[in-house]
Amino acid sequence: MVEKGAVDDADFLFGVHLRPIEELSLKQAASSIRHGAAGFLEGTIHGEDAHGARPHQGINAIDVISMINIGLKNIWLRPQSSYSVKMTRCQAGGDNLNIIPGNGHFSLDVRAENNTLLEELKKRIEHVIESAASMGSKTSYEWIDLAPGAEVSEEAERFMRKGILEVYGEDKCTGPLYTTGSDDFHYYTVKRPYLKAVMLGLGADLQPGLHHPYMKFDHSCIMDGVEILKQTVLKVLEDRG
């Protein structure tokens, strides 16, 4: 969408996302969702297999991945900040119980409360992975996907709040929601910094959780969301004359 110029002549960008019942109930809405930043890494251990009777002839990929995982758990940033690093895949070895695997694969899910913190976290993670070479193995890695954190326009959020007030009233309008989740919506403001963007948080009595296989929500919220966005756009047009 961005590369094809779909937002080149846009001043504002308004999005919407349902929120779980722990955050918002039906007929409640938040003036913005402050998503965190996220990154996903795939890593590989390169080596030669060895026989179980001759472990000195190879480097055990399982040991290397274990060392990396321990190193990741010893990354400490500012305690006031929200961040996390989790190993989500670890594969090494095969069906033969007497073979020490020289090759392995691992994946990481990395999250931080903002883009600056994510960049700092990425550097620390890369240092941990590269340090594993001290065991004598070769490692490689690639960041396969990055989702930027929210860059919310205060002006856009003010208009969103006015739209919520028109539909739900003061008592059903909440302030910003901060979440460790991420969303592709925020690529727009990274690629086009002049865009004034904000995402509406919409209550739907959604449970047990977002993206859960048995997720359920009250579908009546959909038209509420449409009306809030309509009122928000009308407020912008009124302001611009």
Model-derived features: where do they sit?
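Metal-dependent amide/peptide-bond hydrolase catalytic core
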Residues: 63-241
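Histidine/acidic-residue-rich, glycine-tolerant segments that coordinate divalent metal ions
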Residues: 1-84, 94-99
